[in-house]
Amino acid sequence: MTIPTVEIAGVPDPLPVAVLDVREDDEWAAGHIEGATHIPLSELPARLGELPKGQTLVVCKVGGRSAQAVNYLAQQGFEVVNLAGGMLDWAAAGRPMVSETGADAYVL
C-alpha cells in the first residue's frame, strides 16, 4: 500500500483539514499545531473514536511515525495523509505553533 504523503509546500495556510499529531507527550507540550488532536502513536488503536472527522493531516517530528499511523488508519477506512518532513519542516517553513506552557513553541 502506498502511503498518501504531502510535502510542507503542498499544505495550504490556513489549514483546510484536521490535524492529528502522533508524537509523545513531551514533544507535544514543547510545540504543536494549534487545534491539532494529540494521540501518541502507541495509543492510536485504542483511541480511534477520538480521531477528527474527514480528511486529516497526520504529523510527527520527521514523518516516520506519522507514516505508520497513516498506513494503519487508511486500512481502518480513515481519509488521512502524512506530512513528509513532519514538524521539523513545519517549523522550518515558519508555520505557526503553540506550546502547552505558553513559552515559545519549538520542535523537540
Each model region followed by its residue ranges:
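Rhodanese-like catalytic fold shared by cysteine-dependent sulfurtransferases
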Residues: M1-A18, V22-T56, G64-L108
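Short cysteine clusters
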Residues: C60
